[in-house]
């Protein structure tokens, strides 16, 4: 009993065609073709210069099944598809699904058939699944223009054995052994423009089965469809009842479309936390300054001066514990009537001009008790010990423990070669508090030990560098004198080394003169030859 053809359940989508022929040895052969997978949609690839590289294959790829049955009928015959010794190939052509009405003016473009690009021919592949048969697969078929089309598949056979030839050749144009057998057409499918193309769906189970057996088929694991809001009652006029709506319903359960923005559950709600509203600024006044803030690179600030002492027993108001840890904002107050006469200099630096500015901040409160400078003030001069670490790090030469004046010690720009430049002072700010700080007890800071002798930095003249020998050629003008006058009638430049005499000749016939590269004149002695 013959094995029946594997025909899917829905005959509308699976077109079947059969033919019967008799060979030279009176073998009765039946050819049955079935379109297992119909094309449904495609995107037009255009007809420009990039149309050949911009492929938009028909989705899903058409799959055609072929069976060869030997016997008096299909039902009683035997399936010899795998045993039949012949080659088959299927050729695809594109046709319009509806006849086009010719206009009044027949243009050449109107009569031309639609253009089908890609690979229109396919050889038969012998597969075991879904059933044992021969399959023709077209994974690379593209259409250039939009519209409603159908595909026509033509079957050609190349017979290898003479006993399988036809009794009479059917077509004389074909070479011997090549015969046209039959054709089959697909259902109409739509080709959309790039703007109207709805997208691609997930690959069918048949495409995945064929691809698993080694056939070249593109497989998509997800749905690439555009979500569009269609008008109620408006259907697809180009579908032509080809089962496109049925396939969309079959795959709608497996679609994984990204939810729209209108879905309230798809968007994360805004956090109700108000922690960012109560956040303090980054620049906190109580923050301890870092090393970068402690030693900024800009030029030195305006020179500070001392506040007028409220009493004779009060001296400079620095070194207080409340202002020794963190710097305070600088405040400059103009004191027109204050003049402080500096004491005699005890160190190697001379006092500079007085500054009318008053500085109330203390440079980071770093005090070194190694140097006892003098402190000039209206009160009796007392020795005290104070050192600014910032002064030591801002100079190039390490400071010596010699005696400095207080004014020259705290002024960072008090150098003999750089006089202070008047800087535009900011607007005077009112003092927050008129209360004065307690006077610093100098007696506890003064060391009874006599001041150390001044240590001067050992500076000397920079060593002279040896002259650099720059090699090079002497210029031609420094050795040879050239005349700028024009030369006529075979005249040549006159060599000043020879004067007016002939170049290279001397009164002695056995001696010659020549000019060397360094400009000197040298002589050469010729050999004497006597005529015999």
UniProtKB/Swiss-Prot annotation:
Composition-biased stretches (Basic residues): 217-229
Low complexity bias locations: 392-406
Pfam families named in the record: Velvet
Biased composition regions of type Polar residues, renumbered to the chain: 349-358, 480-492
Biased composition (Pro residues): 295-307, 417-428
Transmembrane segments: none
Motif Nuclear localization signal mapped to chain: 40-45
Source superkingdom: Eukaryota
GO CC terms: cytoplasm; nucleus
Chief place of localization: nucleus
Subcellular location: Nucleus; Cytoplasm
Region annotation PEST: where it falls in the sequence: 431-462
Knockout-associated phenotype: Impairs production of beauvericin and attenuates virulence during infection of tomato plants. Impairs also growth on the non-preferred nitrogen sources nitrate and nitrite.
PROSITE patterns: VELVET
Occurrences of domain Velvet (ranges): 26-220
Biased amino acid composition, Basic and acidic residues: 244-253, 275-287, 382-391
PANTHER family in UniProt: DEVELOPMENTAL AND SECONDARY METABOLISM REGULATOR VEA, SPORE DEVELOPMENT REGULATOR VOSA
Role description: Component of the velvet transcription factor complex that controls sexual/asexual developmental ratio in response to light, promoting sexual development in the darkness while stimulating asexual sporulation under illumination. The velvet complex hat acts as a global regulator for secondary metabolite gene expression. Controls the biosynthetic gene cluster for beauvericin, a depsipeptide mycotoxin that functions as a virulence determinant. Also regulates chromatin structure and transcription of siderophore biosynthetic genes and is required for infection of tomato plants.
Subunit structure: Component of the heterotrimeric velvet complex composed of laeA, veA and velB; VeA acting as a bridging protein between laeA and velB.
Recorded family membership: Belongs to the velvet family. VeA subfamily.
Protein name per Swiss-Prot or TrEMBL: Developmental and secondary metabolism regulator veA
């Amino acid at each position: 009993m013959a094995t029946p053809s594997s025909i899917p359940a829905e005959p509308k989508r699976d077109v079947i065609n059969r033919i019967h022929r008799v060979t030279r040895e009176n073998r009765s052969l039946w050819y049955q073709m079935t379109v297992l997978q119909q094309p449904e949609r495609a995107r037009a690839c255009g007809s420009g210069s990039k149309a050949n590289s911009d492929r938009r294959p028909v989705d899903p790829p058409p799959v055609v099944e072929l069976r060869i049955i030997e016997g008096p009928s299909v039902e009683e015959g035997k399936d010899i598809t795998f045993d039949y010794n012949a080659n088959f190939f299927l050729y695809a052509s594109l046709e319009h699904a509806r006849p086009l009405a010719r206009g009044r003016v027949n243009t050449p473009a109107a009569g031309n058939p639609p253009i089908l690009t890609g690979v229109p021919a396919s050889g038969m592949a012998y597969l075991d699944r879904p059933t044992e048969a021969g399959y023709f697969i077209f994974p690379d078929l593209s259409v250039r223009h939009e519209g409603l089309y159908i595909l026509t598949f033509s079957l050609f056979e190349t017979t290898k054995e003479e006993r399988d030839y036809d009794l009479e050749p059917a077509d004389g144009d074909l070479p011997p052994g090549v015969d046209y057998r039959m054709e089959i057409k697909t259902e109409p499918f739509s080709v959309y423009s790039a703007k109207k193309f709805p997208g691609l769906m997930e690959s069918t189970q048949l495409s995945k089965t064929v691809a698993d057996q080694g056939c070249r088929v593109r497989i998509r694991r997800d749905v690439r469809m555009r979500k569009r809001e269609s008008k109620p009652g408006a259907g697809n006029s180009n579908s032509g009842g080809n089962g496109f709506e049925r396939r969309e319903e079959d795959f709608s359960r497996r679609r994984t479309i990204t939810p729209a923005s209108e879905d309230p559950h798809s968007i994360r709600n805004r956090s109700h936390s108000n922690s960012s509203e109560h956040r303090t600024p980054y620049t906190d006044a109580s923050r301890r300054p870092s090393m970068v803030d402690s030693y900024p690179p800009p030029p030195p600030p305006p020179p500070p001066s001392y506040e007028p002492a409220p009493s004779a027993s009060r001296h400079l108001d620095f070194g207080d514990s409340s202002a020794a840890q963190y710097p305070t904002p600088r405040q400059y107050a103009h004191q027109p009537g204050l003049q402080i006469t500096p004491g005699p200099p005890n160190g190697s630096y001379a006092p500079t001009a007085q500054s009318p500015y008053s500085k109330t901040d203390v440079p980071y409160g770093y005090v070194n008790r190694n140097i006892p400078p003098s402190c000039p003030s209206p009160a009796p001069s007392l020795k005290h010990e104070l050192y600014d670490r910032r002064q030591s790090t801002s100079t190039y030469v390490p400071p010596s423990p010699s005696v400095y004046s207080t004014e020259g010690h705290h002024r960072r720009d008090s150098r003999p070669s750089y006089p202070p430049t008047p800087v535009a002072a900011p607007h005077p700010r009112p003092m927050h508090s008129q209360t004065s700080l307690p006077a610093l007890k100098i007696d506890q800071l003064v060391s009874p030990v006599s001041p150390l002798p001044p240590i001067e930095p050992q500076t000397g003249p920079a060593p002279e560098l040896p002259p650099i020998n720059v090699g090079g050629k002497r210029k031609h003008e420094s050795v040879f004198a050239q005349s700028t006058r024009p030369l006529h009638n075979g005249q040549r430049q006159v060599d000043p080394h020879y004067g007016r005499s002939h170049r290279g000749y001397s009164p002695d016939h056995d001696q010659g003169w020549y000019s060397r590269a360094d400009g000197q004149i040298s002589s050469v002695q010729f050999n004497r030859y006597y005529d015999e």
